[in-house]
Amino acid sequence: MKMIIDGKKVDSLSGETFDVINPATGKVIESVPKATAEDIELAVTAAVKGQKEWAKTSVTQRADILHRFVEIVEQNKEMLAQTLCAENGKPITEARAEIGNISIAFPAFAEHAKHFYGTLIPQGTEAGQETTLQLVTREPIGVVACIIPFNFPCDLYDQKVAPALMMGNAAIVLPSSDNPLTLMKLTDNRKLNIAIIIYQISQKSWCTRQLSIHTCCFGNCKVERHCGLWICSRNGNG
């Protein structure tokens, strides 16, 4: 399989790959590209460009696109569950449930975002603002780096990606190198704006670090302890 950068399926610029192993059998399932720093720069550049156009779409349009994505997931849910079972090692019943959660979470975030309004602060609510009417609007923050751990890749994918997209952000998704295949297949079976979700695959934690210190990437993430400490230390140092 290939990464997706700027709407195109591509190999790593280095040409390097690594194997995804079935933990139950020890056999190779498939080989995937190993991202380089240059790949990440290309992905971020494409995400920044795509986000500007994506942010111009209405919330209703974004919701329609997410609903169409869910239709594709439903049509391919057994294939996705079998892939998740093979690469993650979890029982097929749990894999099917996790794929099913995508069809719950994406519509939920899509509909909630339609009613996620700004705030109007009336006159006189705050001291010194007796004659001032304050309006707070909600704007996209830009590019969000979604770092996905190995244990519940699809659950964490829908909890990170769906709200980011619905609020007009771009999402760069970094799957775990242990099991990236299901999320990559989700990319092949979706109708989201191709410039918005971009996959980076890497065996090394430096890939996470590269994204965490990039000036275009913001947001919250739950990651391995060493990655979290790295992000905090870099952000603390400005």
Each language-model region and where it sits:
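N-terminal Rossmann-like NAD(P)+-binding subdomain of aldehyde/semialdehyde dehydrogenases
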Residues: 1-131
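Rossmann-like NAD(P) dinucleotide-binding subdomain of oxidoreductase/dehydrogenase enzymes
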Residues: 118-238
